[in-house]
């Protein structure tokens, strides 16, 4: 029997509840609910708003956390950034072969695709606490917990992650550097691109 942090019985599986952009220039988060076309990865309705220091309120409905936010039209720039995250993550899922509930949730949200030339993959390890890939002409993409991707500190990002963790989410950060790291070390110039909010799937009674 699997339980979440609150003791609720779960299926032992996870899902990506939301994908959010992180704007390093303005230290803001693009807030939206996770409603996407499974074929194209594009938002199926206007479900995004750009707001500084967004506060999320959550309520329990049928055992699952439902976000209550003010929804506004997603801008073209934000839509392109979300599509780029889908593109990168699809390629990463095709070269990373982790077998666990989190990886399964990511593969379900980001179907594998193989249209970027891989230089080398960076598999997850218990020492590094992150995984990633280096693509030709694109640089390095890493995915993991914020404190391991940015051990030197990124206060604003850590505050955002902490606020979502208090709501019961597990947060993974996608980060990018234009540098092509030669091994498994974090490259210079690493910047956060987005956050994946992951929840346990509640078992139906």
Regions found by a protein language model. Give the residues of each.
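Cytosolic catalytic regions of ATP/NTP-dependent phosphoryl-transfer enzymes
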Residues: 1-192, 198
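Short, acidic loop-to-helix structural element flanking the phosphoryl-transfer center
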Residues: 198-205
């Amino acid at each position: 029997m699997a339980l979440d942090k609150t003791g609720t019985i779960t299926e032992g599986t996870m899902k990506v509840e939301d994908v959010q952009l992180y704007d390093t220039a303005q230290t803001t988060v693009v807030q939206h609910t996770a409603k996407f076309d499974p074929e194209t990865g594009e938002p199926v309705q206007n479900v995004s708003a750009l707001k500084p220091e967004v506060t999320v309120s959550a309520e329990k409905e049928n055992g699952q956390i439902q976000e209550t936010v003010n929804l506004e039209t997603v801008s073209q720039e934000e839509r392109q950034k979300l599509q780029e995250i889908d593109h990168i993550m699809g390629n990463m899922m095709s070269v990373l072969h982790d077998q666990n509930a989190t990886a399964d949730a990511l593969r379900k949200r980001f179907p594998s695709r193989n249209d970027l030339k891989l230089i080398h993959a960076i598999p997850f390890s218990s020492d590094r606490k992150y995984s990633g890939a280096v693509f030709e002409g694109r640089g390095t993409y890493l995915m993991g917990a914020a404190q391991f991707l940015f051990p030197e500190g990124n206060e604003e990002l850590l505050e955002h992650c902490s606020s979502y963790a208090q709501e019961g989410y597990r947060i993974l950060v996608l980060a990018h550097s234009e540098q092509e790291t030669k091994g498994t070390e974090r490259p210079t110039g690493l910047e956060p691109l987005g956050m994946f909010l992951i929840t346990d799937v509640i078992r139906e009674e």
